[in-house]
Amino acid sequence: MLWTRITPAAGGASAPVQVRWRIGDDDRLTRVVAQGTVVARPERDFTVKVDAAGLRPGATYYYTFDAAGEQSPVGRTRTLPARGTSRLRLAVVSCADFEKGYFNAYRNIAARQDLDAVLFLGDYIYEYATTTPGIERVAGRVPAPAHECVTLDDYRMRYASQHLDPDLTALHATHPCIAVWDDHESANDSWRDGALRLEAEQGPWAARKAAARQAFDEWLPLRESPRMYRRFGFGGLADVLMLDGRSYRDQQVLPSDYVALTSPRRSMLGAEQEAWLYGALRSSQRAGTAWRLLGQQVIFAPFVPQVGSALEVDNWEGYPAARTRFFDCVERDRIADVAVLTGDIHSSWGLDLPRSPLSGYDQTTGRGSLAVEIITPAVTSPPFFSRAGARDRAKQFHSASPHMRYMDGERRGYVMLDITRERLLAEWYHVRTVTERTADESKAASLVCERGSARLVEAGL
């Protein structure tokens, strides 16, 4: 999927613009393999998408757009591989708050030459007002509009503002992207019929949700569909199942409301998406695909009571029946080699996924684990343990969670996945800072899941 946005000339904001596109197999576009014209229209905020057909699988292509006498920079993309591919490399990102710092993680991902795709797990933008009290900002990082995003024009302006960032645009110009939303593309802690602390003057939630979804569809290079959840096949090596944990979920409840919290009907994904997920897992397993990767938003792993009580019920801990149904499917249908990929919590985690970390799970051997979870840190958003005593709290959190194989609650960055038929390698990269634009980063941890093991161990052991 090729994407660009045309900036209308002054006074021409209502006139459609003819756009020519070309795609070829060399960076000078001397060998054009497909081309055509499309129209950028004001009702789509002058964004343009091209679903280029007839391309070879597993191949790198280069593309450009021409409009109104101007040519875009040449972009690079890659097609999904054919069956029989032996290696897959993915970058995983989430939580990129423009105000909180520079997108150094995006900069470093854009510089990589060895990626098949980038997975965005949500919070691509933040809807907050720039005047929200108590929020620390990096000088010069002020998105538009200044007020909280509520209308379609607001959300469009926020995406347009964020796309002025050179590191974000470099990433999109270099790698194909697979994206799903979380809450901040609409409103904090959103659920099926609302969100946290909505104001009456902001209008009905349905209209705001529809506006947020339209802007997301316009500004992201994805094939549009009424449903956001979808499946990507990487040549029989991995199936990536991108889930929508916001549009269909039941409302969050207080931890003290035990009856509501433990209701067997409680759902994170909604009945239709849940059935689709289980069907996709079964068909992937039957097809002999090596790995099943679930791209989703909030922490999936269960936690021991004294630790879990400190977490928000916005995650799967607040939907225990839905999590149990997932475990039932994996166990009943013998679904193997599942990795849950998570964002949202602004920290780096690697976990085994047993039904309970305190019963039927062996920390030493991994027996009882049914899958693994890999959580990517924030690109810029404030770290999970960002205040005084962060390291001590992280150690306490870690020691109370026997299924936790790695955690860093202080640093920003991204995760790299290197996948073969024999193993899945997860590497956490942390940037030195987000308060200045720099490429400085370090590899913080490497965990591996051997096929058939459903557990994470340190790479090289």
Q: What are the residue ranges of the model-derived segments?
A:
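Metal-dependent phosphoester/phosphodiester hydrolase catalytic core
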Residues: 1-461
